[in-house]
């Protein structure tokens, strides 16, 4: 039997950025190959740092998929743990070490006997930075292993161990990264008429873009437009030639995301024209679509966990956090859910420390659900 604590702590020490998860890939492959040795109903494929493990069913008419992400974040860890990150400036601050450990535990359980239906385990790279699920799908990595149903989880620090939370609709927002540069003409502060101030234009833009949420978005639907970074100018008496802004759009529907992108572009172009500036605008959504659960499958999963002893099933509201599993769920029906890990620190916090008691709980309870799915007639 796998030592879940050791695996989680080993993985926690080697966080890597998306598409650079080389040590993580090697570690996972070693465990997977050990579990699947001499089993003739298992095949393994790799895609860059990603791994696909396909368990062939004895009499399949569908394929069930379980997805986990494997990458870390560019964060300096401050947990003080004995098994803290050994990679400088890298941390598993989003719980992907927990996700991988759960997936390996589920794989071990699933291999105890050949199931009726096919079961695919996806160890997906680059959730945080490059939408690895989209990259794998577009590159044909799944081939004929593409599931008919896809499932996955994400740890949630503000829920306690034993909590499973999801809903029958949108669970995560769709996100879009925004990078914008206004370029004018620099000059001496004493001669503003000889320059063209990009900083003033950026200020007008920041103010006007707030009207997207307040006047263009249906208040029942909601949206977020946040610019967290503005860089312009060099000193107090020089007019800024350029102004760079970096922000994010978050919405609960793809239609609203596209509308928000459209209005942001129109405002930026209008500001640039009115101030006679050059504009460089990049809107990057990629694979970060809203995570939309399939209503019937979500209802089935919720009913299953509602009946499980030791599980507190929560019908939860959507969150404005992003997740690239939304792309795969736009191609394959499925469900994502939150798993409580009871940490006082939020996801992406340098002190985020999940309760490891969630590991055996998740492997037992989710293992039962997967067993039900792959053996139903």
Curated annotation (Swiss-Prot):
It catalyses: N-acetyl-(2S,6S)-2,6-diaminopimelate + H2O = (2S,6S)-2,6-diaminopimelate + acetate. Keywords: Amino-acid biosynthesis, Diaminopimelate biosynthesis, Hydrolase, Lysine biosynthesis. GO terms for molecular function: N-acetyldiaminopimelate deacetylase activity. It comes from the Bacteria. The keyword Hydrolase applies. CDD domains: M20_Acy1_YkuR-like (cd05670). InterPro entries: AcetylDAP_deacetylase, Amidohydrolase, Bact_exopeptidase_dim_dom, Peptidase_M20, Peptidase_M20_dimer. GO terms for biological process: diaminopimelate biosynthetic process; lysine biosynthetic process via diaminopimelate. Its EC number is 3.5.1.47. The active site is at 69, 128 (proton acceptor). Pathway: Amino-acid biosynthesis; L-lysine biosynthesis via DAP pathway; LL-2,6-diaminopimelate from (S)-tetrahydrodipicolinate (acetylase route): step 3/3. Catalyzes the conversion of N-acetyl-diaminopimelate to diaminopimelate and acetate. Belongs to the peptidase M20A family. N-acetyldiaminopimelate deacetylase subfamily. HAMAP family: DapEL (MF_01692). This is N-acetyldiaminopimelate deacetylase. It comes from Streptococcus gordonii (strain Challis / ATCC 35105 / BCRC 15272 / CH1 / DL1 / V288). The lineage of its organism: Bacteria, Bacillati, Bacillota, Bacilli, Lactobacillales.
